[in-house]
Amino acid sequence: MRTIAVLTSGGDAPGMNAAIRAVVRTGLEKGLKVMGIQRGYNGLINGEIFEMDTHSVSDIIQRGGTILRTARCEEFRTEQGREKAAKILKAFGIDGLVVIGGDGSFHGAQLLSKLGINTVGLPGTIDNDLAYTDYTIGFDTSINTVLDAINKLRDTSTSHERVSVVEVMGRNCGDIALYTGVAGGAESIIIPEKEYNADKLCKQILQGKLKGKMHNLVLLAEGVGGANELAKYIEEVTGIETRSTILGHIQRGGSPTCMDRILASRMAYKAVELLISGKSSRVVGIKNGKIIDMDIDEALAVERSFDQELYDIATILSK
């Protein structure tokens, strides 16, 4: 192993820069040449590859986003596109590739490994939807961003004695809504993993009003969607002024938290070690506080287990 490369793919996540920094500096310390690939698999196919040194990653650990940029790539979805990508990697003398991204990015790394490319994946996604790992890079920053937003919404919601319906990211995984719902004291948490009844929700809101609640905070994962429509329905049924807020892409930005910076650094260090030791087609994660690695096929096949205990806690504390 003499030359490795790193790319970021899919949706950006805070902490990606910390991971890039750790890959580059660990690789250089181990005597490797390190290349950066811009704009994910799209940049790989177009040969947007450059050599990186320790100064390339100076002053980035505190920055959100990714200095390597990220992009979707339809061509890479084709067999011809992947073969082209593999040839370009070999032409640049790249022996190992670190891919930072979500499940789609991992599927790409998985397919490249079948073409003889040594790959290691790092979980970079705010959704926390990769089941093999307890946490993904970017999740902690995202939930802190959401928590800050709902704290502010609670202030104005209380002043006006209204209901706030807040839609957060999470298509198939409701972790952002669940974690921030518990931490932010939400009265209701609506997530893809659990069915909900709008009429029952309205009844709960009215019961809360009778108990003297000054406001109601409803957190809604985008996988369920319909924040605007739900807000209108709540107001029609309860007669209580209701407003909807869709937080959107603000959840992906911002300076990464201490936890995300450390997690990204630990995972990236492990990724370089794996490549040096000759291991390929692996992904890095964290379980019970320990950095782990596993086969990428096995990791993608792991079924996600829902945190029922945390959901039960949220339900009890919201009353």
Swiss-Prot record:
Its cofactor is Mg(2+). Belongs to the phosphofructokinase type A (PFKA) family. ATP-dependent PFK group I subfamily. Prokaryotic clade 'B1' sub-subfamily. The lineage of its organism: Bacteria, Bacillati, Bacillota, Clostridia, Eubacteriales. This is ATP-dependent 6-phosphofructokinase. Its EC number is 2.7.1.11. Homotetramer. It is an enzyme of class 2 (transferase). The gene is pfkA. Pathway: Carbohydrate degradation; glycolysis; D-glyceraldehyde 3-phosphate and glycerone phosphate from D-glucose: step 3/4. It comes from Clostridium botulinum (strain ATCC 19397 / Type A). Substrate binds at residues 125-127, 162, 169-171, 222, 243, 249-252. It comes from the Bacteria.
